[in-house]
Amino acid sequence: MEKKHFRKHFTLYLCFLILNLAFIWGNSLVPGDVSGEISGGIFEVVSDLFAVFGDKGQFVLRKLAHFSEFTALGFFLTGLWRNTPCRERTTPPLLLGLAAACIDETIQIFSPGRGSSLIDVWIDFSGVCLGFLLSRGLRYLLDRKGSAGR
């Protein structure tokens, strides 16, 4: 039964991870002008929330989007890695998240009207780290709740 439980969780995290990476890298393949139109449309909907940033509001929204995408990635990588027999569970998800951020920025080098940014790599990796911490924190709370009920 334990092996079935393991496979189920591993498969679930792997599917979410693949979808998340497809979303991240798919957005990086979008030409700069189209990407700007998409974020501009989203900004129109949420502009009141970003009014405090003035004319930098759309810039902040784009960076927050990077951070959020990679927070999800860090969460899924950590959950996936937790469901492997590997003993080391900290370094691999963080390094894989950093690699994904570097790949993302590399894709943007070759996308028309886009460019690469070292700052974006750091923003992305910060998101991965938050996702890692959220996954670990949630797992801790669930384990604690489970052991309290026994």
Pin down the residues of each PLM region.
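Short, charged juxtamembrane terminal tails flanking transmembrane helices
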Residues: R144-R150
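Membrane-interfacial alpha-helical segments at the cytosolic side of multi-pass membrane proteins
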Residues: S68-T84, S126-L142
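Internal alpha-helical transmembrane segments of multi-pass membrane proteins, especially GPCRs
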Residues: E69, T91, L95, I123-S126
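Small-polar-interrupted transmembrane alpha-helices in polytopic inner-membrane proteins
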Residues: L17-I24, T90-I109
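Interfacial helix-loop-helix junctions of multi-pass membrane proteins
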Residues: A101-F125
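Membrane-helix interface segments
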Residues: K8-L12, P85-L94, S117-L118
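"…centered on the first transmembrane helix and the immediately adjacent amphipathic helix/loop
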Residues: E2-F75
